[in-house]
Amino acid sequence: MRSQGNMSDRLGVEVDCHSLGSNECPSMGSSFSPLESPTPTPTSIYSQGSLASPSWPENGSYPGHAYDRGTGSTPIRGHFRLASMPSHENMGLPPYSSLDGQDRMAVTDFLPSYDENADQFWLPSDVPKTYDHHVHGLPCPPSMHQYPPMLRSNYRHHPAPYFPESATNPCLSRPIFHHQPERLPPSLSMSHMMPWMGHTESIAPETIAPSQVAPVTPPPSYTDFSNSINTFKTHSPDTPIRSCSLGTVSGADTPLSRLSGGAGEYMDECHQSPIYRDASGVRLQRQPSRKMARKQPSKQSLSLENLPSIIKQVQFKCKEPGCKGRFKRQEHLKRHMKSHSKEKPHVCWVPGCHRAFSRSDNLNAHYTKTHSKRGGRNRYVATLDETSPDYNPDYRGPLTADGRPMPGGTLDESMPSREISMEWDE
């Protein structure tokens, strides 16, 4: 597409139609077709970049319309030269009717001083808008659209009027709650905001399906919210209702209802979850469950208030000098005292060992940890090994070289009998 400046240099109109012949008139081809837009356009010889001009009167010019600039002495034919342009050249531009509304340019965008001298280019409304190709001899198709006359004020570029969103959005321009039409002030309706719109151009009021409106509830006002709270307090069903329920009596739970004026009192009651209200409005403590009742005594026993002021001291102390042993039970002290005695009555029966212990439990530990394992420095005894087939902890007798018991053999040595200690730590 050529630039606007080059196009404006080549645009021009021969005003004096007496000097134009039938072959010198610009062709009315596809590039110069009239506008196909349904919007009425001004019948000017410079209409919106289209070179299609209306029909000329028989005398060739209009009296009282000097096609000259108002601010200069140079006629406009000196600025716009169209006669030198080839008749079939379409300037590389698409037809104006095929352009979108945003791509179309006004004449004032590339013609200087057009807006201020627009009075000189407007034709009377009573002039016919069609060409008579028999009279003028112009190659113009007879099937040309006739545009109704329009006012000049409709052609000027007026700024788009500003309307609030409630006036342009049909969802906000009418009340969507049929049972409470007073929620929306009548001043915000579409008919009051745009009285200049005709009946055919107005938007249909029913733009929301009833299925979409049904589950929606109107946001309650402060007075409705207070009334619902009072009704909720005086309600006495068969089962107690928790006061922290976020729903109102009507079941409406909207964000605006939680932000209304009574939300402070409403949320304060929600923090009182373990409290019920009866019909008279008196608070009743919720009955604790049995499980909670069982846990309460154990928690009370662990509190510092229930503990005794003086902890019971250890009563049994070791009397040996230098020993700080303390015991809670007497049998524990007795067993401890054997460790301080010089007597070691419990002796190992394994040949070659003969270790003695003061306590029988220590001797049993010696059997289990020392003689029941292979590879140690102590002698292995198969009768003391739980994993061996010869396991017999009561066996006392001669052993083979590998630690197995000898068949029919008995131990004649005078050794202390194996004592099993019945004492253990508690």
UniProtKB/Swiss-Prot annotation:
Residues 30-44 have a biased composition (Low complexity). Residues 288-297 have a biased composition (Basic residues). GO terms for molecular function: DNA-binding transcription factor activity, RNA polymerase II-specific; RNA polymerase II cis-regulatory region sequence-specific DNA binding; zinc ion binding. It is found in: Nucleus. It comes from Aspergillus fumigatus (strain ATCC MYA-4609 / CBS 101355 / FGSC A1100 / Af293) (Neosartorya fumigata). One of its GO terms (cellular component) is nucleus. Its main location: nucleus. Disulfide bonds: none annotated. BrlA, abaA and wetA are pivotal regulators of conidiophore development and conidium maturation. They act individually and together to regulate their own expression and that of numerous other sporulation-specific genes. Binds promoters of target genes at brlA response elements (BREs) containing the conserved sequence 5'-(C/A)(A/G)AGGG(G/A)-3'. Positively regulates expression of the gliotoxin biosynthetic gene cluster in actively growing vegetative cells, and likely bridges morphological and chemical development during the life-cycle. Regulates (directly or indirectly) the ergot cluster genes. Residues 45-58 have a biased composition (Polar residues). Disruption phenotype: Abolishes completely conidiation. Results in production of bristle-like structures instead of conidiophores and conidia and fails to produce ergot alkaloids. Reduces significantly expression of gliotoxin biosynthetic gene cluster including gliM, gliP, gliT, and gliZ. Impairs down-regulation of genes encoding ribosomal proteins under nitrogen-limiting, but not carbon-limiting, conditions. Abolishes the production of fumiquinazoline C. A zinc finger (C2H2-type) spans 316-340, 346-371. GO terms for biological process: conidium formation; regulation of transcription by RNA polymerase II; sporulation resulting in formation of a cellular spore. This is C2H2 type master regulator of conidiophore development brlA. Induction: Expression increases dramatically during the synchronous asexual development. Expression is positively regulated by hsp90. Expression is controlled by upstream regulators fluG and flbA. Expression is controlled by the histone methyltransferase clrD. Expression is decreased by 2',4'-Dihydroxychalcone (2',4'-DHC).
